[in-house]
From Swiss-Prot:
Protein's name in the database: Small ribosomal subunit protein uS5
Compositionally biased spans, kind Basic and acidic residues: 1-22
A UniProt-annotated Pfam family: Ribosomal_S5
Self-association and partners: Part of the 30S ribosomal subunit. Contacts proteins S4 and S8.
Length: 200
């Protein structure tokens, strides 16, 4: 009897999981970063297709990217979107609007610099970086690309910079300090930087 009950519970969970996944997917926002025409040389000639790059996020601190290839554009976008959903990562955000600290990212020849910004700054970043920030839910940030303008390299470099973000609680626990000590230092540093800018 106990085994039968366990099996029934397992079946119920299996039935509930797809619904939960559907609800989660419905909350995600996707953006098409770029699409290219590709060709594969085979014995009989060339097979042409399309490669799509898509970023997906819930605008609450989770985002991912994916790349898909297919003969038709819609199918390539669908594959890229599905891959992006499987690659979702959570990025800690300060006040749910900006980054906790500045960061650098790199992938191949792509290099990006991301800087936390005060309220009202907006998203000062172009192209692929802006798409990533919008699906992630970042409202105030300054981003700059210093390397390759290849969309794929820029997206990978942006995520490399984002994955380096650390929550003040995590940093405080590792250093044996209080959260207020970490936040206080950050505030003091920002005020000093503001004073230096005003003097210059």
């Amino acid at each position: 009897m106990a085994e039968e009950r366990g099996e029934k519970r397992g079946r119920r969970r299996d039935r509930e999981n797809p619904r939960d996944r559907d609800d989660e997917s419905s909350e995600l926002v996707d953006k098409l970063v770029g699409i290219n025409r590709v060709a594969k040389t085979v014995k009989g000639g060339k097979n042409f297709g399309f490669a799509a790059l898509v970023v997906v996020g819930d605008q609450k601190g989770r985002a991912g990217f994916g790349k898909g290839k297919a003969r038709e554009v819609p199918e390539a976008i669908r594959k890229a979107t599905e891959e992006a959903k499987r690659n979702l990562v959570r990025i800690p955000l300060r006040e749910g609007r900006t980054l906790h600290h500045d960061g650098n990212g790199r992938h191949g020849a792509g290099k990006v610099v991301l800087r936390a910004a005060p309220p009202g700054t907006g998203v000062i970043a172009g192209g692929p970086m802006r798409a990533v920030m919008e699906v992630l839910g970042v409202q105030d940030v300054v981003g700059k690309s210093l390397g390759s303008s290849n969309p794929y390299n820029m997206v990978r470099a942006t995520f490399d910079a984002l994955k380096g973000q650390a929550n003040p609680r995590t940093v405080a626990s590792k250093r044996g300090l209080k959260v207020q000590d970490i936040v206080g230092r950050r505030t003091d540093g920002a005020s000093e930087a503001g004073m230096a800018d005003s003097v210059n």
